[in-house]
Amino acid sequence: MGLFDQILSAIDDPNQQANPNQLGNILGAVEQLSGNQGVNTGTTQLAMSVLGGYVRSALQNVRSQSGDAQAQQIVNQFSGTNPNPQAVQSLFGAGQLTQIVNDIAQRTGLNNATVRAMIPVLVPLVLNLLKTGSNAQNPAQGSNPVLNTFLDADGDGDVDITDTISMASRFLNQRS
């Protein structure tokens, strides 16, 4: 089951946090970031997808070294729709961040300064997508199928965040 399918499942499950408003807030933040940076939404989604690969790798390392609960703790603590440099610092060192900025810039055509400005917004948004599978009453407890799907992906380097954002947008448009 893909990432968006897991998010839809979480929306249908009252025991999980996902809801249409949460998805709408994430989509709205992507659109606002795009507007603020003068970048089209598709490019922002591509940047988010490339960054998602690095977030997955960082969370996989956390999970292998400290367990599922610590990976979930990072998702819970740093997810959101506002810029959060601490979210970036919790996952990436300074040297790794330079590599990430260069990779995103190369793959999107954006300049490094724009990418560097976008990352503190995009990391919390990626984590917010992953938080949709958290337990609604006690996010630190229980399994998070959205996070598990994300972390257990096939490792082909393709994180389906762009597809997930596009499908979420269509899903929300059909509901309105």
Residue ranges, per PLM feature:
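A structural "flexibility-hinge" signal
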Residues: 1-176
